Amino acid sequence: MKEFITKHRDKFQKISAISGAGISAESGIPTFRGSEGLWKNFRAEDLATPQAFSKNPKLVWEWYLWRRNIIETKRPNPGHFALVELERIHPDFFLITQNVDGLHSQAGSKKLTEIHGNIFINRCISCGQESKETISENTTPLPPQCQNCNSFLRPGVVWFGESYDDFKLNFSIQRMKHTDLLLVLGTSGSVSMPVYLAQIAKDSGALLVEINPERSSFSSSVDLFLQGKTGEVLPELIREILDNPS
């Protein structure tokens, strides 16, 4: 790690990070994939789609409220706070997260885009109005309705088969094109978007550093692979970067 930083210290002008489910898992949040994602024998892929919502919006909302309840009991971990510290000290840093749990914001990240949305946002399917009003199965008929136009509300996340928000996507692409150092944190590459963004960064000349407990689809193309949990390895990496300013 030290040799890598010393050799490439002039590459630390513009630093970006992509975070995935691994950093949230360190806070105790299930990945909601595979066996962890099963709820009443439904898989995430069965419920997180426009078709599922159109067919049974009440069922989809019940699943998302179950997920919200789990996430609300969790707190940011050292990996989240290390990114906040990097943002505070480094003048040109930006974070792109796949995670919808809001823990990066809760930790204090400001230069952040939640490319898959935020599970605590409610968005109207007709007028697009968004809110963070608390929804409870005990007090709110499901699916909840928009106060502006009375259409159904849906969770403000990107579902399987949906397009990404144009502004968030275009901003992320431009950021990758002008990034010197990209940190890939806790994402396996099973979702195509982070792989796509990382490839843009690499093709544009960025150095790639991956932190993951196990090797992933990114590992063969990164410049440095650091095995371990983000919350354990990232603080050490950031200390090295900040101790060796460019």
UniProtKB/Swiss-Prot annotation:
NAD(+) binds at residues 20-39, 98-101, 186-188, 212-214, 230. Its EC number is 2.3.1.286. The keyword Amino-acid biosynthesis does not apply. Keywords: Cytoplasm, Metal-binding, NAD, Transferase, Zinc. The keyword Repressor does not apply. It catalyses: N(6)-acetyl-L-lysyl-[protein] + NAD(+) + H2O = 2''-O-acetyl-ADP-D-ribose + nicotinamide + L-lysyl-[protein]; N(6)-succinyl-L-lysyl-[protein] + NAD(+) + H2O = 2''-O-succinyl-ADP-D-ribose + nicotinamide + L-lysyl-[protein]. Binds 1 zinc ion per subunit. Residues 1-245 form the Deacetylase sirtuin-type domain. Its cofactor is Zn(2+). It is found in: Cytoplasm. Substrate binds at Y64, R67. Pfam families: SIR2 (PF02146). GO terms for cellular component: cytoplasm. Zn(2+) binds at C124, C127, C146, C149. It comes from the Bacteria. The active site is at H116. One of its GO terms (molecular function) is protein-malonyllysine demalonylase activity. Belongs to the sirtuin family. Class III subfamily. 2 residues (Tyr-64 and Arg-67) present in a large hydrophobic pocket are probably involved in substrate specificity. They are important for desuccinylation activity, but dispensable for deacetylation activity. NAD-dependent lysine deacetylase and desuccinylase that specifically removes acetyl and succinyl groups on target proteins. Modulates the activities of several proteins which are inactive in their acylated form. This is NAD-dependent protein deacylase. It comes from Leptospira interrogans serogroup Icterohaemorrhagiae serovar copenhageni (strain Fiocruz L1-130). The lineage of its organism: Bacteria, Pseudomonadati, Spirochaetota, Spirochaetia, Leptospirales.
